[in-house]
Curated annotation (Swiss-Prot):
Gene3D superfamilies the record matches: 5' to 3' exonuclease, C-terminal subdomain (1.10.150.20), GIY-YIG endonuclease (3.40.1440.10), UvrC, RNAse H endonuclease domain (3.30.420.340)
InterPro entries xrefs: GIY-YIG_endonuc, GIY-YIG_endonuc_sf, GIY-YIG_UvrC_Cho, Hlx-hairpin-Hlx_DNA-bd_motif, RuvA_2-like, UVR_dom, UVR_dom_sf, UvrABC_protein_C
Name this polypeptide is given: UvrABC system protein C
Key words, A-Z: Cytoplasm, DNA damage, DNA excision, DNA repair, Excision nuclease, SOS response
Subcellular location: Cytoplasm
Domain GIY-YIG stretches: 19-97
Gene: uvrC
Domain UVR span(s) in chain numbering: 208-243
GO biological process, one term: nucleotide-excision repair
Function: The UvrABC repair system catalyzes the recognition and processing of DNA lesions. UvrC both incises the 5' and 3' sides of the lesion. The N-terminal half is responsible for the 3' incision and the C-terminal half is responsible for the 5' incision.
Main location: cytoplasm
Organism: Leptospira biflexa serovar Patoc (strain Patoc 1 / ATCC 23582 / Paris)
Entry GO terms, CC: cytoplasm; excinuclease repair complex
């Protein structure tokens, strides 16, 4: 139940809100902003969160944590939309969908504010009259595009303030025909401006119209016997056409369109844009998202459309979205119209070619998300090993780690399990099971002593390398017995720690008190993964031992099943596992087993399957 005093305090604040548009900020008990929202009428929107019987999963989860409220009134809902984006970027609230990377993506800048513009990459977009194209989520793609422009268009590449007081000597680019040489005064401002216009159309995706204009200019130059200029224009046309031939035609109407796909896994997600310009698929952009645990596709796309399209410099005419993203985007579209003087259409195709493109975008989004998750895991594994070496004062990077656990059922059939992680990942060939014999009752420390002694002795006898770190699932007592076993073999220092279950604390040999570390750190995640995997592996083996014993006991205890019939049953099914899966009809086929006996065996086996280890 939410504290009544907390609710009363919030309700008093709500009374002062009125019906103004603006943004509201929910905070937790620590004063952290956990959610930012916008509303046309703040009071009614905020009050809706205080109903404890919410149907919406996200609102229920938010209700549990909300402790305080803040707000900022705005003049219009469009202003609230823009402010919401700023506040989310500032506070990074956990219940908001947001772009995962807060880094600034690069743009291509055409410095049209200069007399003789140049094209370059930048991460800063200035309101200075220059033209910007992007953002590019792939830095390599941005560099490749810049290189392509420099290869096709003879624009200047040196950062000089032109025009110069006195002409410079021509550079290599001029001699190779890759620059018109404005630093020498070899080109008029009008001619250079025509070149810049060509680049702008190229970047806007208007390549078909650009080629048509270049062909017209080439014919005009040829008719005036300006053959050198005509030759340069012909080369430019050929290079652009070569590029267009590599691009797939996906829209016969030749429009500028963005096709958006999304992939989600728990709190993480990826939105991918397929960019169609002039009817041709020109490229893709992929954006990582987070905060998706409690959000549907409509909220995810609402946040993304706001964050992305209100920051681009060139708009497509149409944006295609999956039907799962259908919703009210009126405020966003009004903001686009106000900023750009033109709007875009949002469409949600349910069939046809555009639906196929949406599936393609979704597939690519999923591939991109998978790649990102794998890269994150690899990075976390590397960080975890480095943290372990530093925090546990290990002599070497723990590339090979082994973890040991004891499993039993109320003291009976005890087993030990050992798992091995190499480079932070499970290494199944290194997994081992051990049957513990000769123990009466529960004696985890004694069993840990035995299994460590057996494991290390085996490694020494087989001349195999020792692990870089051994983790014991248990506290001080279990760790002490494990260390005794290692010391008795006189193998020198073998790094060893114990991971206590209750508080996830780490024990060191010879020290009475445990150490606590950041539970969310890669190091602790790796140790928990080791411990959980050892436990899973041990429980699975223990379950198998119990079933084997129970099966043998069942066959022994059923009247009229002697050694001969028991042998016939096991030989007929070849494996005990198959016996437990046998039907009544299959059991009847065994020599010497009739319908009555088959029914008894079948009933006992079904009771056996209900056994679950603790």
């Amino acid at each position: 139940m939410k504290d009544s005093l907390v609710l009363k305090t919030i309700q008093e604040k709500i009374k002062n809100l009125g019906s103004l548009p603006g943004c509201y900020l929910w905070k937790n008990e620590l004063g952290q902003v956990i959610y930012v929202g916008k509303a046309l009428k703040l009071q009614s929107r905020v009050r809706s969160y205080l109903n404890p019987n919410q149907k919406d999963r996200k609102t229920r989860a938010l209700f549990v944590e909300l402790y305080d409220l803040d707000w900022i009134a705005t003049g219009t809902e469009k202003e609230a939309l823009l402010l919401e984006a700023t506040l989310i970027k500032k506070y990074n609230p956990k219940f908001n969908v947001r772009l995962k990377d807060d880094k600034k993506y690069p743009f291509l800048c055409v410095s049209t504010s200069e007399d003789y513009p140049m094209v370059f990459l930048t991460r800063k977009v200035k309101d200075n009259g220059d033209r910007y194209f992007g953002p590019f989520t792939d830095v390599k793609a941005a560099r490749d595009t810049l290189e392509l422009i420099h290869r096709i268009f003879p624009i200047r590449k040196t950062k000089l303030k032109l025009p110069l007081p006195k002409p410079q000597r021509p550079c290599l680019n001029f001699h190779m025909g890759r620059c018109l040489g404005p630093c020498q005064g070899n080109v008029t401002k009008d001619t250079y401006s025509e070149l810049v216009d060509e680049i702008l159309r190229f970047l806007e995706g208007k390549k078909e119209r650009l080629v048509a204009d270049l062909k017209k200019a080439m014919m005009d130059a040829s008719s005036k016997m300006e053959y050198e200029r005509a030759g340069f224009l012909k080369q430019r046309i050929e290079k652009i056409n070569q590029l267009r031939e590599k691009q797939t035609v996906v829209s016969m109407d030749g429009g500028d369109e963005d096709i958006l796909g999304i992939s989600k896994r728990e709190d993480e997600g990826q939105i991918l844009i397929l960019e169609v310009r002039g009817g041709r698929l020109e490229g893709k952009k992929s954006f990582p998202l987070t905060g998706l645990s409690f959000s549907d596709d409509e909220e995810a796309f609402t946040s993304f459309l706001r964050d992305y399209y209100l920051n681009v410099t060139v708009l497509p005419s149409v944006v295609y979205l999956p039907t799962s993203a259908k919703g009210n985007y009126d405020v966003f579209l009004e903001a686009i119209l106000e900023k750009f003087g033109t709007s875009i259409k949002l469409k949600f195709p349910e069939m046809g070619p555009k639906k196929s493109l949406l599936r393609l975008a979704e597939k690519n989004a999923d591939l991109s998300l998978t790649e990102r998750i794998l890269a994150t895991k690899l990075r976390d594994q590397t960080v975890a090993m480095k943290e372990l070496q530093e925090k546990l004062n290990l002599p070497t990077l723990p590339r090979t780690i082994e973890c040991y656990d004891i499993s039993h059922f109320q003291g009976s059939l005890p087993v030990a399990s050992g798992v091995m992680f190499v480079e932070g990942k499970p290494y199944k060939p290194g997994y081992r099971h051990y049957k513990m014999r000769g123990y009466e009752g529960i004696n985890d420390p004694g069993m840990i002593h035995e299994v460590i002694a057996r494991r290390l002795s085996h490694l020494v006898n087989e001349e195999e390398p020792l692990p870089d770190l051994i983790v014991i699932d248990g506290g001080l007592t279990q760790l002490s017995r494990a260390a005794e076993a290692a010391n008795a073999l006189d193998l020198g220092h073998i790094p060893m720690v114990g991971l206590a279950k209750k508080r996830e604390e780490i024990y060191f040999p010879g020290e009475k008190h445990p150490y606590s570390f950041d539970q969310h750190s890669p190091m602790m995640r790796l140790l928990r993964n080791l411990r959980d995997e050892a436990h899973r592996f041990g429980v699975t083996f223990q379950r198998l031992q119990r079933k084997k014993k129970a099966l043998k006991s069942i066959l022994d205890d059923i009247p009229d099943i002697g050694a001969s019939r028991r042998k016939s049953i096991l030989m007929y099914f070849q494996a005990k596992k198959k016996v437990t899966d046998a039907t009544r009809q299959e059991l009847e086929k065994v020599q010497g087993i009739g319908p009555v006996l088959a029914e008894k065996i079948f009933t006992n086996i079904q009771n056996l399957k209900k056994i679950e280890p603790k």
